[in-house]
Regions:
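A conserved structural/catalytic subdomain of Rossmann-like adenosyl-cofactor enzymes
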Residues: 1-242
Length: 242
């Protein structure tokens, strides 16, 4: 289990040292290290969690497993090192699942986070994507508001992973080919079915609804015209120097 720092302050010297280590260990850091970027708050920083993630994957045995807390942006990134790592893990079929957590779930960061589960023995298996972003309840924690998962919330997530059953608007169970078709996205929401509800109406019911819509629109148009006239009238009364 790992909760690496996401984007800490990083000096040029620190970045140069990391770059030198990465260059000497291409097997451990096959996708290199993220660039040093300017930040108004801390000066310069780097998305160092991507370096930690590569190191963790390299450290695992052939049947190794890991749970890693990452910024939720990682699961949908379409470019850069983040996308390359995610694509690599999916191509290798080492992903077991992802839980996208509610906002403000951690005291140390306001960044939305997800937990990535890696299992090198999951080749040919299924992947569970769980959207827990709407779960839990908000409470005051000192000066900040945090969101807390209840024991029952936690059990729902655990049961979904263990049973590998999809839950409407909550979780999906996929094979790796399905994930590849969605540009390697690990966001559960991108796989939820879009439902369109249809209502059968009789001719009389249809006519009644249409008349109601027309009446409402006419009322809105009239209110808009009244407001427009009022504004124009007040503008006419404005004079320079008043």
């Amino acid at each position: 289990v790992s909760n690496p720092p996401f984007e800490p302050q990083t000096s040029q010297n620190e970045w140069d040292e990391m770059k030198a280590i990465a260059d000497l260990n291409p097997d451990r850091f096959p996708f290199g290290i993220p660039n040093l970027i300017k930040d108004k708050r801390v000066g310069t920083k780097t998305y160092i969690y991507l370096t930690f993630l590569q190191h963790i994957v390299w450290s695992l045995s052939d049947i190794g497993r890991a749970a890693i807390v990452l910024p939720t942006g990682f699961i949908t990134a379409s470019t850069g090192i983040g996308f390359k790592i995610r694509k690599y893990l999916i191509e290798k079929q080492w992903i077991k699942g992802v839980v996208s957590m509610p906002s403000n779930i951690f005291a140390t960061t306001g960044t939305n986070v997800s937990v990535l589960f890696i299992d090198k023995s999951n080749i040919g298996g299924k992947v569970v994507l769980f959207d827990a972003s709407k779960m839990g309840e908000e409470r005051n924690d000192g000066e900040k508001k945090r969101r807390y998962l209840s024991k029952s919330d936690e059990q729902v997530i655990i049961d979904s992973f263990n049973s590998k059953n999809s839950m409407e608007d909550c979780s999906v169970v996929l094979n790796f080919d399905q994930i590849k078709e969605k540009n390697y996205s690990l966001s559960a929401g991108q796989y939820f079915d879009i439902k369109i509800e249809y209502f059968e109406l009789t001719p009389d019911e249809f006519e009644t609804k249409m008349n109601s819509f027309k009446t409402n629109l006419s009322s809105l148009f009239n209110e808009s015209k009244t407001l427009e006239d009022d504004i124009n009238s007040q503008l006419e009364e404005l004079k320079y120097g008043d």
